[in-house]
Design a protein with these regions (language model features):
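Conserved Rossmann-fold cofactor-binding substructure of NAD(P)-dependent oxidoreductases
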Residues: 128-148
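Non-catalytic terminal and boundary segments that flank Rossmann-like NAD(P)-dependent oxidoreductase
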Residues: 2-70, 84, 93
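N-terminal Rossmann NAD(P)H-binding glycine-rich loop of SDR-like oxidoreductase domains
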Residues: 72-85
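Short beta-loop-alpha junction of Rossmann-like oxidoreductase domains
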Residues: 162, 230-234, 272-285
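Conserved glycine-rich Rossmann-like NAD(P)H-binding loop of the short-chain dehydrogenase/reductase
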Residues: 87-107
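Rossmann-fold cofactor-recognition segment
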Residues: 114-133
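Catalytic loop of short-chain dehydrogenase/reductase
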Residues: 158-189, 199-263
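C-terminal helical subdomain
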Residues: 270, 282, 286-330
Length: 330
C-alpha cells in the first residue's frame, strides 16, 4: 500500500506512445505527460502496465469467440473507440448501446468500414441509461441472444458545456436542482443500474464452481470516473459541484458492489481517462493544454484503459485508477 499525505510516483519511460491492438501497433508523436501527483493515500496498489502485462484471465476472455462485450455511450468519442478497439483486441461479440440507433453518423461510418465478418460481430441496441425499463429490455435481449456478458463498459456520461446546459457550475449560486439530478441520473445511477441488471449475465461462478466451459473465469465491469471525484485530492480549483458529486457517488457504487460481484467471479473498476480529446472535453481545452500534451488522443486513452483492464487482478477490484495504472485516493 502507498502511504503518506501526498504520493508521487516515478514516470515509467515511454519515448513514444504505442497503441497495441491484437498484434497491430500504431505509433504516434504524442507523448503523455509525467504521472499525476495525487493528494491523499491510495487504498489500492497500482496496476503495472509498463511491462505490457496481460493476465491469464484477460487472455482467455479476449480470445473467446463466444465472449460478449457491452459498451454504453457507443455513438461517438470514447464509447465508439472502445467498440473499435475491442473489435481488434478481442475475438468476441460487441454490443454497442446508443441512445437512438441510426442517429450516429460516426458509428454508422465506422461500422460501414468493417469487413463482413467483423460487422457481424457488432450488435447495436438502443439504451438511455436514465431509463430503467430500457436497461431491463437490454438485459432481456442479451440474455435471450447470448446468455452471458463478459465485459460491461459503462462509458455514457455527461458534464455539460455551461453554454447550453446549467453546468458545470463555477460557484454555489449556479447550482440547479434539475441539472444536479440529471448528472446523478447519467453518471451514477445509470452505470449502477446497468451493472445491476446485467450482473446475472456477468456471473461466472457459484461458490467455487465455475459456470462456463469456455473463456475466462472472471468477467469485468469498467466504469469511467474522473479525478475531480476524489475527495482526498480535492484541495481547490473549480467547483463543478454536480459532476464531482455524481462521479464520487459512482466511485462509492463501484467500491461497494465489488465485494458482492467478486463472489460471482466479476471484477469491477473505476478509471480516470485523463483529459481526452472528446466532445465532452472540447469546451474546456486550451491551446496551452494541447501544446503541453495534456489533451490525449482518444485512441491513446482507450488503448491505455484496455491495457489496465487486461492487467488487473482480483486484488484491484473495486479500485479507482488513472490512465497510467496509478491508484487514485478516494
Amino acid at each position: 500500500m502507498a502511504a503518506g499525505n501526498a504520493v508521487k510516483l516515478v514516470l515509467r519511460s515511454r519515448p513514444l506512445a504505442i497503441y497495441a491492438q491484437s498484434g497491430r501497433s500504431f505509433s504516434t508523436s504524442f507523448q503523455p505527460p509525467p504521472n499525476n501527483i495525487y493528494h491523499g493515500q491510495p487504498v489500492y496498489n497500482h496496476i503495472d502496465i509498463g511491462s505490457r502485462k496481460i493476465t491469464d484471465a484477460a487472455v482467455a476472455r479476449n480470445n473467446d469467440v463466444e465472449a460478449v462485450f457491452v459498451v454504453t455511450g457507443a455513438s461517438r468519442s470514447m464509447g465508439l473507440e472502445f467498440v473499435k478497439q475491442l473489435l481488434t483486441r478481442t475475438k468476441g461479440k460487441i454490443v454497442a448501446l446508443i441512445l437512438r440507433p441510426g442517429s450516429s453518423p460516426a458509428l454508422d461510418q465506422a461500422l460501414g468500414q468493417l469487413s463482413r465478418d467483423d460487422r457481424a460481430r457488432v450488435n447495436v441496441l438502443p439504451l438511455d441509461v436514465t431509463n430503467e425499463d430500457q436497461i431491463v429490455n437490454v438485459a432481456t435481449e442479451l440474455n435471450e441472444t447470448y446468455a452471458r456478458v463478459d465485459g460491461l463498459f459503462n462509458v455514457a456520461g455527461v458534464l455539460g458545456d455551461k453554454t447550453t446546459t446549467a453546468g458545470p457550475e463555477m460557484n454555489l449560486s449556479q447550482l440547479d436542482q434539475s441539472w444536479l439530478q440529471h448528472q446523478f441520473a447519467v453518471n451514477a445511477v445509470g452505470p449502477m443500474m446497468s451493472t445491476s441488471k446485467l450482473a446475472p449475465l456477468l456471473k461466472t461462478r457459484k461458490g467455487k464452481k465455475y459456470l462456463r466451459n469456455t473463456g475466462s473465469k472472471e468477467s469485468v465491469v469498467v466504469n469511467l470516473s474522473a479525478r475531480v471525484a476524489s475527495m482526498s485530492d480535492n484541495t481547490g480549483g473549480l467547483a463543478w459541484y454536480s459532476y464531482r458529486m455524481s462521479k464520487a457517488a459512482l466511485n462509492q457504487g463501484v467500491r461497494a458492489s465489488s465485494h458482492e460481484l467478486r463472489r460471482q467471479g466479476t471484477w469491477t473498476i473505476a478509471l480516470y481517462p485523463g483529459m481526452t480529446d472528446t466532445d465532452m472535453s472540447k469546451p474546456f481545452q486550451t491551446k496551452m493544454m494541447q501544446e503541453k500534451g495534456l489533451v490525449f488522443p482518444v485512441e491513446f486513452t482507450v488503448s491505455r484503459l484496455l491495457d489496465i483492464v487486461d492487467a488487473m487482478e482480483e486484488e484491484n477490484t473495486g479500485g479507482f485508477f488513472d490512465w497510467d495504472g496509478q491508484s487514485i485516493p478516494f
